[in-house]
Regions:
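Sec-dependent N-terminal signal peptides
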Residues: 4-13
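Alpha/propeptide regions of enzymes that mature by internal proteolysis
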Residues: 17-386
């Protein structure tokens, strides 16, 4: 009966053009997810994407093929209301702008944007222009905030030196930002990304935790583009070794441009409605690598593993003139939030892989989606699903 159920679920997703997620395949995870099992389960958080896909065949710089985009995350919708935040880098072969001020001030004052490595500058500049045009600061007499823009490298599939992300794509991602279910896989900034030897991209997940009889949400969004297939682990099963010779990456570019095994990056954004101060949010992001390690991440030399966490609690914490009173959980009670963070990161990465579809790009380079049918058989072999 369970076999029939899984089959029906997969068929229904295909016919409805809705991408399945890890739990839809029966993959087990620890912890209880929120309504959407996404970062948007944290009230006020909005996510939007702009996706750019065009061309096929040989790479002509400036012409394509293009496989890239932009993703936008707003902590409290499209209004200026800074949140407590902090960040951490497991391995710093990457970039996230604006984090120096996040560390210094303890606040995230801007939306978070994620794109490809070569488009950080244009995205940052476009966000600054949007501040002015949108009147982001409202009645605040404010002179400047530092846009937070993260990146991962999509040059295996994308004409990354063609600089195809433009201001209009940044504005489109911002305008598309909304609450509710989060689109995953080959979307937005994750369009051209790879994960653990298969196609990757954007993924999201959430957890509900109870502390002193009060429920809190931890939500995660990843732009996943890291790892070596041999390390891929799902539900504790060495899936990568089982699929080591299946649907390998097709690489037709010049040898000098070949991607090294294990290189890549991952951007992780953690949101919570639990009342946490910046130093506690630093502790939250320190737990992100646990989830990455659970699926096979190793923080390689060529990887940019950069994480940021924010709390939407304490809505009036930011004030330029007055003393404010804020709430915070005691350190002795926040271990469940650590566990929830690791769990949601792990599931978000797998969701990115499950939602991703096979994609070809420059020179016919191809990244295959992880085969759902084979994955289910492997997990059954190891008694992880019935």
């Amino acid at each position: 009966m369970k076999k029939l159920t899984i089959f029906i679920i997969i068929i229904s997703f295909l016919t409805a053009n809705i991408k399945p997620r890890a739990r839809d395949l029966g993959i087990p995870f620890f912890g209880k997810p929120g309504r959407y099992n996404a970062i948007t389960d944290v009230k006020g958080v909005e996510v939007g994407h702009s996706t750019i896909i065009s061309g096929k065949g040989k790479n002509i710089v400036g012409m394509g093929p293009v496989r890239t985009g932009v993703t936008a995350i707003f902590p409290r919708g499209k209004k200026f209301n800074p949140v407590y935040a902090n960040w951490y880098s497991l391995n710093g072969n990457g970039e996230m702008t604006g984090t120096t001020w996040v560390t210094e001030s303890g606040f995230l004052e801007t939306p978070i944007m994620i794109t490809n490595t070569n488009s950080v500058g244009v995205v940052r500049d476009a966000v600054l222009k949007w501040y002015v045009d949108y009147n982001w600061y409202g009645n605040e007499e404010w002179w400047y905030t530092y846009p937070v823009v993260g990146e991962t490298y999509d040059g295996f599939l994308n004409d990354i030196y063609g600089f195809h992300v433009k201001e209009k794509h940044v504005l489109e991602a911002i305008e598309n930002a909304r609450s509710g279910p989060v689109k995953e896989g080959n979307i937005g900034g994750g369009t051209g990304m790879l994960t653990l030897g298969f196609k990757g991209g954007i993924g999201s997940a959430s957890r509900v935790v109870k502390i002193n009889d009060k429920k809190y949400i931890v939500g995660v969004l990843v732009q996943s583009n890291f790892g070596s297939r041999k390390n891929l682990t799902i539900s504790g099963v060495p899936v990568g070794l089982e699929l080591e010779d299946t649907l390998k990456l097709v690489y037709n570019a010049p040898p000098s441009n070949k991607k090294k095994d294990g290189d890549g990056s991952i951007i992780v954004i953690v949101a919570t409605d639990a009342p946490l101060l910046p130093h506690q949010l630093k502790r939250i992001v320190h737990r992100v690598p646990i989830g990455i390690g659970n699926v096979g991440g190793r923080g390689s030399n060529g990887s940019g593993d950069i994480f940021l966490a924010f709390s939407t609690a304490n809505k009036n914490a930011f004030n330029r003139q007055k003393t404010t009173t804020v709430r915070t959980l005691p350190n002795d009670l926040i271990t469940p939030l650590f566990e929830a963070t690791a769990q949601a990161v792990e599931e978000a990465i797998i969701n990115a892989m499950i939602a991703a579809e096979t994609m070809d790009g420059i020179h016919g380079n191809t990244a295959y989606a992880i085969p759902h049918d084979r994955l289910i058989k492997i997990l059954k072999k190891y008694n992880r699903i019935d």
